[in-house]
């Protein structure tokens, strides 16, 4: 997607460990128009037949995930990085590596 490439080239910074810092439009400050265009592009690129929800990771993924879920007409589910006391019932969990924090994280 050229619009996203242009924004990364214009505003992104490469940090040690090859992490691309895009907090000016993707995580700390969110450009919702760009997010909407990204959601539309995902809808164009992927077969959404049978899609029942959008799953993303808590924090940075929520903004884009919410706009994608709205665009696709399905609910948003986000995986938490820590169990809270108000979650009941069985949980799915998966271990991932966080490149930002340089450690393994268990998502619930």
Protein language model annotation of sequence segments:
Residues 1-50:
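Active-site-facing substrate-recognition patch
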Residues 40-42, 63-64, 103-108:
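A generic local structural motif
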Residues 45, 59-60:
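N-terminal leader/targeting helix
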Residues 50-58:
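Short glycine-rich phosphate-binding loop at a beta-alpha junction
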Residues 60-63, 83-85:
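Short, catalytically relevant binding-site loops at active-site mouths
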Residues 63-72:
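Short Gly/Thr/Asp-enriched flexible loops that form oxyanion-binding sites at enzyme active sites
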Residues 74-108:
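Short, glycine/charge-rich flexible loops or terminal/linker lids adjacent to PRPP-binding catalytic cores
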